[in-house]
């Protein structure tokens, strides 16, 4: 049910944990054709806030239904909420820089929304704010927990992740995943190549140029935390791990990426080679959604969405606690059925 890579072990997860969801936006998501993490490019800026609201409340306030792809595939926040319902951990939403603010309690890192990486993603002032404040958050969480799981929500985050990995010297071109089964590699490559022109030499200034607020918030929280960390995400979390490694070469021994089988088996990406380059362990949930009653859920098995909002890590935590695949899928269907019954969501 859970596959282990590069020395990852599930036994470290048998303890109470807090779920941290870091949200933010990047104007890269406004580039047509780059991401399907929203029904239209403009709606992608609502996705992180709506994801956070749904995970905490079971409904969205910023938009009238959960985020969906242009073809109606539901957000992975649905999988996250279903998995966490069996465990009920403390859930904390952290705003690293979201254009739309969630209508729920959250911690603000005093960052800013990411701009177009082809010009300049973030100001140095906001980069420092995000890193310093997230390090402090991680330190405070260490007083109560030995384990935290960090998820992310930022449409177009795989593009900024690829730019970040390349800017830090990794072989990442065309290796990151996509929420679409048709990974828009040529468009991503064109955007990233333009972003990487005339890079500064200082690593922090490079991150300010081509990264995004969420990657910095995830990295900072991890750097401040003293215990074990499950980075719940796909190829984006390899970029977060690369940033962590840039600051502290010893930190990755306490960190594992927890993702989905749809990421590690993605034929149009190579997440495992990225993890190996960075030097971070990987766990993958082998959750099978083909038995779902809903086409929108079964679409995950066809390469749609794949990961996000901590879906893979949350499924791993539920499976570690003894929840069966069938039980988890029934819960996902139950939550999706409630949404279909109360809105114009397509099935």
Swiss-Prot record:
GO terms for molecular function: nicotinate-nucleotide-dimethylbenzimidazole phosphoribosyltransferase activity. InterPro entries: Nict_dMeBzImd_PRibTrfase, Nict_dMeBzImd_PRibTrfase_arc, Nict_dMeBzImd_PRibTrfase_sf. SUPFAM superfamilies: Nicotinate mononucleotide:5,6-dimethylbenzimidazole phosphoribosyltransferase (CobT). Pfam families: DBI_PRT. Belongs to the UPF0284 family. This is UPF0284 protein M1425_0030.
